[in-house]
Regions:
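Beta-rich carbohydrate-recognition and catalytic domains
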Residues: 1-20, 26-189
Length: 189
């Protein structure tokens, strides 16, 4: 799916579209585009023989797609853990860059916010004061022109050794597209 805002593609992500029955919904936050024209362009996988003759117009997912100001994230899934951390929706993998700063533990993890399987790799983010109760935060690092976000690590730079500011959280990670590159991101807030 390509997200197009005012005739410009701003995001691209892979989604498993429900053909006959919708098993789950995936939210896409449009609030940052308030007042702008947003459209979605679907490209079906032509190599999949099941989908060759289908279009978004005759699929269950598009018939049930809707705008909403809220998204129910109540954990109703039979196999989703209740004691160990898991995201509100989507798929997660290995934790990356766990740090402690100002009385809070920060957990970063590989995350697909658009499906229940591997893909669309972002770094999810959650914080906790006790490592049991977690507050979900917005995606920390999202794919860009260099690719999706793979494994890495993070540190708190208490002494400003990197020059980004004392106490900055610095993440170093692999990005993947047609080749892999090493990237760095930092936050001072």
């Amino acid at each position: 799916i390509s997200m197009i805002v005012n005739n410009k593609e701003v995001k691209n992500f892979d989604v498993r579209l429900a053909i006959h029955k919708v098993d789950y919904f995936v939210p896409v936050d449009l609030s940052v585009f308030s007042g702008k024209t947003v459209s979605f362009k679907f490209k079906m996988n032509s190599n999949d023989p099941i989908r060759v003759n289908l279009s978004p117009d005759n699929t269950a997912c598009c018939k049930e797609m809707k705008l909403s100001d809220t998204f129910d994230t109540t954990n109703r899934e039979k196999f989703r853990p209740t004691y160990h951390f898991s995201p509100l929706y989507g798929w997660m993998n290995d934790p990356n860059g766990m740090v402690y700063k100002d009385g809070e533990y920060h957990l970063f993890y590989q995350y697909n916010p658009y499906g229940s399987k591997w893909g669309n790799m972002n770094w999810g983010h959650a914080i906790s004061k006790d490592l049991v109760n977690w507050e979900h935060r917005p995606v920390a690092i999202a794919p860009d022109a260099l690719g999706t976000i793979f494994s890495g690590s993070a540190v708190v730079d208490h002494n400003n050794t990197a020059g980004f500011g004392a106490g900055a959280i610095i993440a170093i990670y692999t990005q993947n597209s047609d080749r892999q590159v090493q990237s760095i991101a930092y936050s001072t807030d």
